[in-house]
Amino acid sequence: APAADGLGFNTAILVAPSGELVARTRKMHIPISAGYYEDTYFRAGPADGNPYPVHRPDGLGARIGMPTCWDEWFPEVARSYSLGGAEIVVYPTAIGSEPVFPAFDTQPLWQQVIVANGINSGLFMVVPNRTGDEGKVRFYGSSFISDPYGRVLVQAPRDEEAVLVADLDLDQRRDWLELFPFLLTRRPDSYTPLTTPVDAQRPYGAGHEATAVVK
C-alpha cells in the first residue's frame, strides 16, 4: 500500500490453484537509470524483518524465493536466498532494449549474470520474462530455467509466448554445494564494504569522483 510519499511496493506473489494468495515478496532494488521510471511509482522493500523470505507452499515440494526483475543483477540477493535454504529462485522479469541505448542487446549479459548467481549460490533459477513491445522498449523474452551446474535446461524464444517445463532434481543443490562449499567458506567478517552505502558523488567506488549522476 502507498505510504506518505505516495509510492507503493513492486510485489511478487504466489497464488495457489484455488486462488489463495500463499506468498508474497517485496522487490528490494529499484532501477534509477536514464529511461527507467519505476522509482516514480515504487519504493524499495523494507530491509527490516525478513526481506528475502523463503516459502515452502503445500504441494510444491521445494523451498522457493521470489525476488523481482532488477533484483536479479545483485549476487547478494541469490546468496541471501541460498543461506535461507531456498532451492529455487523465481525472478518475474520485464527486461528488454535499453531506453537510451536501444541497439545494445543486454539479453546475453542478463542471462549470464543470473546463471552465474545460480552457480555461486547453488540454486535453480526460474526466470519468466516479458515479450512484446511497449513504447520504445522491446522486451526480449528468452525466459529460461537453469540449474546449479550452470546448465540452461529450457529456454523460450525472444519474440513469442511459451510455456516452459523442466524436471528439477533438487538433490543437485546439495551435491553442488558439497563439491564446491561456497557457503561454508564464506568470510562475512571481511565483507564490511558490502554493507556500507555508496556515496552518490562516488557511484563508481571510493576514489572516483562522478562528473554527473544521470537520472
Model features per residue range: what roles?
Residues A1-P2, M125:
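Glycine-rich, aromatic-flanked loop segments that form ligand/cofactor-binding clefts
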Residues V15, V22, V54, V77, ...:
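Extended aliphatic helical segments
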Residues G45, F124-K215:
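C-terminal beta-strand edge segments of enzyme domains
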Residues A3-T93, S97-V113, L179-P181:
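Active-site catalytic loop in hydrolytic enzyme cores
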